[in-house]
Amino acid sequence: MTSPLPNVNTAQTEPPASVSFWQAFGFWLKLGFISFGGPAGQIAIMHEELVVRRRWLSEKRFLHALNYCMVLPGPEAQQLATYIGWLMHKTRGGIVAGVLFVLPSLFLLIALSWIYIAYGQVAWVAGLFYGIKPAVTAIVIQAAHRIGSRALKNNLLLAIAAASFVAIFALNVPFPLIVLAAALIGFVGGRMRPEFFSAGGGHAASQANFGTALINDDTPTPSHAVFSFKRLMQVLLSGFVLWALPMGYLVTQNGWDHTFTQMSWFFTKAALLTFGGAYAVLPYVYQGAVEQFGWITATQMIDGLALGETTPGPLIMVVAFVGFVGGYVKAVLGPDSLFLAGALAAMLVTWFTFLPSFIFILAGGPFVESTHNDLKFTAPLTAITAAVVGVIVNLALFFGYHTLWPQGFTGSLDIPSALIAVAAAVALLKFKLNVMHVIGVCGLLGICLQYGLK
């Protein structure tokens, strides 16, 4: 990605040559290994590669797809890759694009989770996480600021964000109820006062012109992307079978209360609630994985997010860490198969977390294209996105508390951690430094502190 960008004033008028399935396969495989930087960075990479350099689709078609991926629960960057793959090469193109977006990070996280759980007490590893944890707190604060600055366009949306914060922080209201309440407010409010809900968290169209694209603004919708009730039923039935078969096997073989079964059911629910991306669903994962089931500890949850920030792929892949640690610590396959238990748990939760995203795109792609700019459809999203801001602020406080006061408020403030957190926040918010660079520097500081260079 070092070639110069096209000059928008001298855009090419001829579309590029048609792209074969295997050419696209090569790109999606590459993307799976370079998709660092969270959803914003991943979407930027796809925009540069697919719109600017390769011209596989136009700016308008790209943003149209992105806006509707934002409507759906689930990781929007992975869904966008699935959507574009589907638009270009039908169902198999969508499946390949979505799977390759996730697969490298799954294997990396299984390996890193094993190193973490097996060697986490080694001095340099402990020091690395000591430095990264405060950086993660700053990253979550940055996420709240970024989403809030885009989503809270008026006082009503600000009030929704404040109410969601109070609900989850002070009243411990479950995250699903917060999402439902926000959606209802948006649904009703979009009819009563539409002006308050027309400035939601979508992505505005750009006037940039990078040349004629393979799928251009006026390119007719491919036949496979035209809505068909029969095709919709086929996709929904196939998706249900792909969910029901492994779930049924787990229930019949292990019982409903087995760790594998509970993980599969819990992360199925989590997949349907990830409006606003990974940061929005993490409080729900925390409520279940830490407080309800005890699969991991609060400290491990923070460490898992740190690992998720440093690997390619969707940030929601932190669920693979939760699954691995839970399966490993619970020794669900016995004391002699700890790694296998962790790896199977990681793969299970990844399957049940991402399966709904594929169903949403393959089944709903034709439908959501027909609802472009329909306020009845987008107003609930606007309200949910506002509520997500309050939830993320709560998440930042949760991480800050456990990082800066490791013994609770009765103990003393961890001054080095506080200084690292402040420095990371300044680097991210004021100087707009790369997240990976900030994490790397903070990790090195943690190692130095661990070895006594205070």
Q: What do the PLM-derived regions correspond to, one by one?
A:
Residues M1-L72, E76, Y83-T311, L315-K454:
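Multi-pass membrane proteins that catalyze or facilitate reactions on polyprenyl-/lipid-phosphate substrates
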